[in-house]
Amino acid sequence: LMKRLEVVLKRNPEERYMVGELTLYPDRKQVFTGKTEISLTAKEYQLLEYLMRNQGQVLTKENILETIWGVDGQFVVDNTVSVTINRLRRKIEPDGERQGYIQNVFGLGYRIGEKER
């Protein structure tokens, strides 16, 4: 029985997204920096998951608003995305680095990737 379980577990590894030390487990709705679990609000988690699922791609504020908040921006304040990104950065970046995992792409939007040194 144990051998069967091991075979099944190896066949179906748990889904996860990784960027540097940052790991997100969508099934468990958990985020870790190294071995430390990070506590996020629902919107922060949704935003981080969206960024990590689209790793390396530039996502516009409008696209993020529509996907995460489900609106085209008409009922949400302009800087909602920026404020949520800043809160998220403070939680996931070492010392709240401004351009760590989440990077601004001037005039276009945001993307997540390895930290720029």
Regions found by a protein language model. Give the residues of each.
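Basic, amphipathic DNA-recognition helix from helix-turn-helix-like DNA-binding domains
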Residues: L1-M18
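A structural micro-motif at secondary-structure boundaries
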Residues: V19, T23-Y45, R111-R117
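Positively charged, aromatic-enriched patches within helix-turn-helix-type DNA-binding elements
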Residues: Q30-A42, Q46-G100, V105-F106
